[in-house]
């Protein structure tokens, strides 16, 4: 059994189509100034025909495998964090497994909404450290724009689509996930949800007419819960790793809303120049937001070998998750 699970590969994929705030001005009653002031978003990527969850996940997964220098046949486990699967079943991870060529590898989905990447990172790391898996391909992908009411300016301006992936392998040196704090409050499940389409409320013509197949969220309440839980779980994760915010080279938060990111950074007493932000170009990509940010942080050399990074997220459920990782790749 390994002491640690190092991140040896990473990759991302986003749709080709870019939807700007100027485009949205022509679709709903809104403005670039209104959107940027309230969210910090300038544009987002929108999935088109053929750019479904498995397709983006396969593209991100292939990029991560190439970076790790692994053949897909060496992967023994494929995990996908998503709440927008290709279809109710089978698990979309099985489609990803076949698509990347990881023949006969174990494959399963996990659902933790926007917290999915950190939740899945804990699962993947535990499998590697326990010896249950050796080479894990972990992908996070969501296509929320298929569940958006494009007449609702409060939600249609927020979301974008994308996928991010990492490869985890055993390591005897301190690397990868050092600590992780997961949490949820199911009593707040209705603050953000898609009501129709499950076994509680199967999609019927009447529910579709009511728009119950679209994302609903109580933004004001989400803001309060998000800032509180992201900050609290971040401090807990740092304490579990024996570190303080001063030891962290970079904070990589879930890219939901610039106001949430700024308020969380303030509670953590971390200057914004040590907080990675790219939601201005991608919007809220749900579970994919942290791995996409991670890939770009590495590309921009804001995360280097030996650095500690704090990942923190919050999502529907309500769920939250924070983790400390040590970057070991050169």
From Swiss-Prot:
InterPro entries: ACP_syn_III_C, ACP_syn_III_N, FabH, Thiolase-like. Keywords: Acyltransferase, Cytoplasm, Fatty acid biosynthesis, Fatty acid metabolism, Lipid biosynthesis, Lipid metabolism, Multifunctional enzyme, Transferase. It comes from the Bacteria. GO terms for molecular function: 3-oxoacyl-[acyl-carrier-protein] synthase activity; beta-ketoacyl-acyl-carrier-protein synthase III activity. Pathway: Lipid metabolism; fatty acid biosynthesis. Catalyzes the condensation reaction of fatty acid synthesis by the addition to an acyl acceptor of two carbons from malonyl-ACP. Catalyzes the first condensation reaction which initiates fatty acid synthesis and may therefore play a role in governing the total rate of fatty acid production. Possesses both acetoacetyl-ACP synthase and acetyl transacylase activities. Its substrate specificity determines the biosynthesis of branched-chain and/or straight-chain of fatty acids. Belongs to the thiolase-like superfamily. FabH family. It is found in: Cytoplasm. Pfam families: ACP_syn_III, ACP_syn_III_C. Its main location: cytoplasm. It catalyses: malonyl-[ACP] + acetyl-CoA + H(+) = 3-oxobutanoyl-[ACP] + CO2 + CoA. CDD domains: KAS_III. The active site is at 114, 254, 284. Its EC number is 2.3.1.180. Residues 255-259 are annotated as: ACP-binding. GO terms for cellular component: cytoplasm. NCBIfam families: fabH (TIGR00747), PRK09352.1 (NF006829). Homodimer. This is Beta-ketoacyl-[acyl-carrier-protein] synthase III. One of its GO terms (biological process) is fatty acid biosynthetic process. It is an enzyme of class 2 (transferase).
